[in-house]
Amino acid sequence: ILYWVQEYHIDGFRFDLMGLYDVDTMNQIRRELDSLPDGRSILMYGEPWAAEPPQMRRGAVPADKSHVRLLSDRIAIFNDDTRACIKGSVFDMHSTGYINGAWYQETAVRHSFTGWAGPYSPVKLPTQTISYASAHDNFTLWDKLIYAEHKDPHGFDFPDPDCLASNKIAAAIVLLSQGIPFMQAGEEFGRTKRGDGNSYRSPSRINRLEWSRIGLFAELTEYYRGLIQIRHTFRPFRCATGKSIRRMVFSRISEPQMIAFTLPGEAEDPWRMAAVILNASEETRAVALASWEDEPLPKQWDVVADAQHAGVTALRTIENDHITVGSRSILVLADVR
């Protein structure tokens, strides 16, 4: 590993089935990388599970999800709890997540927004969490949505409105959460494998990226682009220290499938405060926001993301005392300085 860094300038390592390695080995790799010039900028993450029970020396502890508390806080893991709460189990094509009906996943989605870090969590810092909704294994996000929404299983090439709405909410959870966001290539244009959930054995016509879908799914592609711009613009969305988690305030909402939080900015941020509101229900709903240490909320907000568009340019303004969110949609609000 050190040779690859020094000779080939590799700046990141992903460990497949990291649970087959032991904690001591992984932590030693991290220490050795950190000792190099600029070594602390090298990314290190992996899958915190093993396909089979690991063969280790007596007393060794596997570097898996159940032992994340023993790993360096500079080693990140794919958080499959985030993946499951967003879209449902990857092992059941018809199971649903928060984005399409599983209201009981609200608490897990809140944890996802915090990167699963906190004083009572084995995750020390949000940057230990890789937030994602899909990867190379299992169904693509779009195919999973088609199946879970009980759509035509052959309609993978149709930008179904319900699936588009669910996909946008999934993207918002991943890209506006604390931690490290991860996307499967092509997720932003509804990548499909024609319903193949185990495509390592499949031909190129299944696994290829169909670039023509960028035109077909232009609305979704631009939505991902806009959410990335929002994350880049407002630094508290990508805080590495945990400060944002402590200042993030969730609203108390009695209706199911609604989540809302505010997050204050720093003095150098272009926004004094941001708010994220999700409504995965089938009804338009109103919400009252709360703030950190009762910091005054603005009288008006700029809407920078809604059901159709996302970005850093204001789409319109709304009054703080009259915030409504359409069914199966999100709002991202900004208090611009």
Question: Which ranges hold each PLM region?
Answer:
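Extracytoplasmic/secreted proteins, especially bacterial periplasmic and envelope-associated proteins
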Residues: D24, Q28, I169, E219-E222
